[in-house]
A protein has these predicted regions:
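Short helix-loop-beta junction
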Residues: 20, 28, 60-74, 123-124
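Conformationally flexible catalytic loops at phosphate/diphosphate-handling active centers
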Residues: 1-37
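Solvent-exposed alpha-helices and their adjacent loops that cap or buttress functional pockets
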Residues: 39-43, 90-92, 123-125
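Redox- and metal-dependent alpha/beta enzyme cores, enriched for Fe-S-associated oxidoreductases
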Residues: 43-70, 83-90
Length: 175
């Protein structure tokens, strides 16, 4: 039992260690990497949270939407464990709706692993933002700019309706 408690304490302390090492790396390389990357979050009304390469596609969708005057943003997770819950909740504090993108099925009937973590972080921070979890890219299926534009359109509709509707969704499934 004591060993498991020590592991848990180590995980609590790991975020500070990661931040310290990231500073050292920035000093050597000139590149800064935080716990997550924020893209266009400074004035975002809606946001996507995700891990991985589809963030590039999402940035393209955000750029297209911002050209039309819509304020979307992105949080790309870099450190998943220990999960930076407080930092993520802080980054999302001003959005009205957020889509959490999971590339893995959770088999829980209420969301994928990232969705569960982000929603728990938002709950603990008493966030008033609507949150929906999308499962996408299963089996290696590509996500397209149009897919991410649809996600942002869904978020815009959620804000307009003042209702998240179904919070556990699939993106790009053939029906």
């Amino acid at each position: 039992m004591e060993a498991k408690r020590n592991q848990a304490e180590g995980m609590k302390n790991a975020v500070a260690v990661v931040k310290e090492i990231a500073k050292e790396f920035a000093g050597v390389s000139g590149r800064e990497y935080g716990l997550f990357e924020e893209y266009c979050m400074e004035d975002a009304e809606t946001a996507v949270v995700m891990i991985g390469s589809a963030a590039g596609t999402t940035k393209d969708a955000i750029d297209a939407l911002r050209a039309k005057g819509e304020k979307g943003g992105l949080i790309k997770i870099r450190l998943y464990r220990p999960f930076p819950a407080e930092e993520i909740a802080e980054a999302l504090k001003n959005v009205k709706a957020v889509a959490i993108m999971d590339r893995a099925e959770g088999y829980t009937n209420h969301g994928g692993p990232l969705g569960s973590d982000v929603m728990a972080a938002m709950f603990r921070a008493r966030s008033q933002a609507y949150a929906v979890n999308y499962i996408y890219g299963l089996g290696g299926r590509d996500v397209r700019v149009e897919d991410m534009e649809k996600v942002f359109a869904d978020l815009k509709q959620i804000v307009a309706d003042n209702d998240a509707g179904e919070t556990y969704r699939y993106l790009g499934i053939r029906e």
